């Protein structure tokens, strides 16, 4: 790309340089580096946080927030049990947790997706919509999950429930993209699934020599917690957000003072998800042996202490589902779950058996995966059920919806009964396999450790550098079976307009506040690196 520049209101200059190598290939993230600035500088700390929010300009909103149903469509009572088809307890336990995730269930029951889906085969959102609808509308019954849900994953033996859970979430996220294949990574993070489960990490490195700050932002769908030295979820989160000193051989190569210097590194949550998936790392990556210890977890969890912006009031989440593993190794044992129905009653979902439980029993389990939802979200859904309010979805005109329904053919696969055809199972198997998915996950696993990147060349003083990274999956043309994968991570190249939007500080959703101070007389070079 040729270098070019743009002056905006006589204040900002945009220059394009070659992209630096990213530390994590799967995510669209950005890094900010700046020199220490005077207190009244237009790039003061408060303004810098606001700028951090603008690192992901959205070219296309794939699932506008107003499209999410306002009120609950879920039945108040608990739904059906799930038949074990042979070593599929991990599938059943994961599906029950997703089924009782209020925003996801409400969206599925609204049938918003199936009315506009143009994929006739292998759509995970359509498959999950059929499953959730059957499960919630058949209380007291036992249903058989569709084979398409685990096609390409299940190999006749027990697998890891968390891996299957994220396999399904990733597949649903990919299903949101068929009509938007050329969108950038930032726009992909506006999908329905990311709006429900997603947020952004912020890894901040502060040079102790020049006090320059480097911020790296990375999207997440779940949060892995190390429980080796933790007795509770809160302790594990504190360890995750604890500042790390970088010195000696691990010293930071500062891109501002252009030397190796001691630094402090802190990992925090920059934006919060509607639904938090917390996975307790109970299994050894080498042996698969289980850390069979009791880790306390609360019914209500305040995430504010772990956010990038402190002192903004409590950010309370409430527990609504727990996935449990009983056994001594990830290679054997049994999975089941506890879920909270709409009316507030807890139930134990053990394959076909559905039994009432208590919060005391729920909180005494050796949990593997915890599901929390923002308290305001849970109360809103519960209130709509108690009032018996007629549900509706925002952002869609009723007349347009009726017209869309009239245009759909009766044999549209997305509107068929939950039992899917064999060709759908075969197609899903061809599109994604467990081994391929695990291979991608190893490359793309969200980690709290972020590699420090070296900034080449000499930078002028008081310069602001934004590194825009992009990921190319590495799928070659001579591997069509890889190109067709449900979990293929497509590449995207930031456009010139996207770079402009970054500089103009277009607001990204988050919790940061916009600075009120602005020096209109100074000019600072803004280098957008691709």
From Swiss-Prot:
GO BP annotations, alphabetical order: apoptotic process; protein deubiquitination; proteolysis; regulation of apoptotic process; regulation of protein stability
EC code(s) of this entry: 3.4.19.12
PROSITE patterns: USP_1, USP_2, USP_3
Annotated active site: 89 (nucleophile), 334 (proton acceptor)
Compositional bias annotation for Basic residues: 510-524
CDD domains named among the record's database cross-references: Peptidase_C19E (cd02661)
Compositionally biased region (Basic and acidic residues): 382-392, 398-412
USP domain span: 80-375
GO molecular function terms noted in the UniProt entry: cysteine-type deubiquitinase activity
Disordered, as annotated region: 382-412, 477-530
Gene3D superfamilies linked to this entry: Cysteine proteinases
SUPFAM superfamilies named among the record's database cross-references: Cysteine proteinases
Family stated for the protein in its record: Belongs to the peptidase C19 family. USP17 subfamily.
Name of the protein: Ubiquitin carboxyl-terminal hydrolase 17-like protein 5
Species of the source: Homo sapiens (Human)
